[in-house]
């Protein structure tokens, strides 16, 4: 008996900004490399492609026997409890033999605290380096403009 092929579907809201949507596509690629799952697909609830339907179809076409949907959201809310499950339910109608589940979003996962700490440390180091180079007091906007790109 072979192990089932598990696909991961990372779902965000979707944006009119291509750069925002590209972040999820990059996250899917990186998670695939990190996790070892062979099928990791990005999907957007609205405003961008691929839709949840399109990504679900792709997972099945690539050989998925089951699909785990991860909401790429920080906090639980209506998108997690209602919208995403409904959109996945609709997508699954084409593939009634494929079981699926929706995980909780990031929430208060301990790994997030490490990420927050890393971002803060990086910003402080950059800020301190800029101050040393300027050899002056920080301008009023230094904190606001420091490290505005991910």
Model-derived regions, located:
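Active-site-proximal alpha-helix that buttresses catalytic centers in soluble enzyme cores
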Residues: 1-150
